[in-house]
């Protein structure tokens, strides 16, 4: 998922389409990321997701506690339509949960070419000021999503706590 790293870390621009209130707590930020993933799955398909990569980042400054939940997953099964149709469906699903303004773009430099969504600032445009970003890409029989949640005040859950289970604690 190297392309997800290319989104950068630039600040929000005046024309940024960010619609969400970022004054949420750690639990709400975690749930927001899960809601985004559920919206993507509702379009792409519920089954077949793998290579899951959940994690917590420390994002505070000057010794301040702040946390950011991240989640990425890949699906290697036939898409329920063309990559463009699926991506358009993902933009509608994101809008339905409050993330209006996501747009479908294309990366013709990669092989195979990809249909991409990068929110809030467009493909390779960076993240919101608080590090928030959604990256989605699709091509024949492949889709992946990477979500960098909002950086919110509070302590990141310790390994083994309910919002950060050890692999052996999972159902």
Regions found by a protein language model. Give the residues of each.
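Sec-dependent N-terminal signal peptides
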Residues: 1-2
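C-terminal motif of bacterial Sec signal peptides marking the signal peptidase cleavage site
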Residues: 5-8
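Bacterial signal peptide processing site
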Residues: 10-14
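Secreted/processed peptides and extracellular or luminal domains of membrane proteins
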Residues: 15, 65-66, 157
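Extracytoplasmic/periplasmic, Sec-exported soluble proteins
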Residues: 21-32, 78-82, 86
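Extracellularly exposed regions in secreted/surface proteins, prominently low-complexity, repeat-rich
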Residues: 27-43, 125-171
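Compositionally biased P/S/T/G-rich terminal and signal peptide-adjacent segments
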Residues: 27-71
């Amino acid at each position: 998922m190297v392309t997800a790293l290319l989104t950068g870390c630039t600040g929000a621009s005046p024309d940024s389409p960010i619609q969400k209130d970022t004054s949420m707590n750690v639990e709400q930020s975690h749930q927001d990321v899960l809601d985004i993933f559920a919206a993507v799955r509702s379009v792409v398909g519920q089954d077949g997701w793998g290579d899951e990569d959940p994690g917590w980042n420390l994002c505070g400054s000057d010794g301040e506690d702040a946390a950011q939940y991240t989640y990425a997953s890949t699906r290697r099964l036939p898409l329920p339509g063309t990559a463009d149709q699926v991506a358009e469906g993902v933009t509608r699903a994101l809008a339905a949960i409050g993330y209006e303004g996501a747009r479908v773009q294309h990366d013709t430099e990669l092989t195979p070419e990809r249909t991409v969504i990068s929110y809030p600032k467009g493909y390779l445009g960076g993240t919101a000021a608080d590090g928030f970003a959604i990256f989605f890409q699709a091509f024949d029989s492949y889709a992946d999503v990477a979500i960098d949640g909002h950086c919110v005040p509070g302590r990141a859950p310790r390994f083994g706590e309910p919002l950060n289970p050890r692999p052996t604690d999972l159902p």
